[in-house]
């Protein structure tokens, strides 16, 4: 599948990785898949993909079933509602770096085994993962879950995607490595001494552009709105792409509005 065709979708391998965590706690796949609108037959198709919205719905269904927004990957659960509280705490931060720091500190208060530390310089902002020595070493999916939560929130708060420079992990290369490279960045290494993600530092001083009014729709759509890679739906590029998706195929008759401008008969997204 071409890279462009993968945008906005998630590999069935990540669906399987998510379900494996809920199975360990005796939760049946069928109910979770039904809530997400994912056909069970897709699990037998290694090249299948689901939409970000479907995977986001599965994410939320598993979190509700386990009452754990970290999917049981830490000895202390991240109870349902934790992400809401984290978002509210980070919303009043001064800038991007402080917002990320608040999210990381919140996770430190919630989880027992996996923590992160921030190290900022002129060249990069490093999110370094630290895990309790007595705990089992985290798998790649645990790192990714943590990252998606704090990264997705921070990108939304500043209204733009933060470029990633490099990522290193202590765990071995996962089976779905191609999917994790889409999630993180191309420069991604495994079996390394330390686990960390380097951010482009330009985001650090950017102001928070979200408000209490925009928080509600963000939480309603989370994590589907950032589960793949955060996109600001109000940015010019996204508006241009949305307009292009709404255009009818070449040669298709176009309706004319009362004001004389042309537009498809059906609005984009209308049923």
Regions found by a protein language model. Name each.
Residues 115-206:
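DNA-contacting interfaces and partner/effector-binding or oligomerization modules
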Residues 179-271:
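Extended mid-to-C-terminal alpha-helical interaction segments
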Residues 11, 76, 96, 143, ...:
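Generic alpha-helical segment signature
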Residues 28, 39, 69, 160-163, ...:
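Short coil/loop linkers at secondary-structure junctions
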Residues 11, 25, 29, 51, ...:
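Residue-level recognition of alpha-helical structural elements
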Residues 84-90, 132-136, 204-205, 225-226:
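Short hinge/gating elements
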Residues 23, 34, 156-158, 182, ...:
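Short polybasic/polar patches that bind polyanions
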Residues 1-126, 149, 174:
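N-terminal low-complexity or simple alpha-helical regulatory segments
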């Amino acid at each position: 599948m071409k890279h462009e065709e993968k945008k906005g979708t998630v590999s069935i391998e990540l669906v399987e990785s998510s379900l494996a965590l809920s199975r360990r706690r005796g939760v049946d796949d069928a109910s979770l898949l039904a809530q997400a609108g994912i056909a069970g037959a897709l699990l037998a198709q290694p090249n299948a993909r689901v939409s970000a919205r479907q995977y986001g719905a599965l994410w939320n269904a598993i979190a509700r079933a386990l009452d754990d927004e970290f999917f049981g990957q830490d000895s202390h659960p991240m109870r349902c509602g934790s992400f809401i509280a984290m978002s509210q705490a980070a919303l009043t931060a001064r800038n991007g770096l402080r917002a990320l720091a608040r999210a990381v500190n919140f996770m430190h208060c919630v989880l027992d085994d996996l923590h992160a530390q921030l190290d900022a310089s002129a060249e990069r902002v490093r999110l370094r993962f630290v895990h309790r020595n007595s705990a089992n070493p985290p798998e790649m999916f645990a790192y990714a879950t943590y990252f998606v939560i704090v990264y997705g929130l921070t990108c939304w708060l500043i209204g733009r995607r933060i470029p990633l420079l490099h990522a290193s992990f202590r765990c071995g290369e996962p089976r779905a490595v191609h999917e994790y490279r889409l999630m993180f960045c191309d420069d991604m290494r495994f079996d390394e001494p330390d686990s960390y993600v380097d951010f482009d530092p330009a985001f650090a001083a950017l102001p928070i552009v979200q408000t209490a009014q925009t928080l509600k729709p963000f939480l309603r759509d989370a994590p589907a709105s950032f589960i793949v890679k955060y996109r600001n739906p109000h940015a010019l590029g996204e508006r241009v792409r949305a307009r292009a998706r709404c255009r009818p195929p070449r040669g298709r008759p176009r309706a004319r509005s009362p004001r004389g401008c042309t537009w498809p008969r059906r609005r984009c997204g209308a049923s």
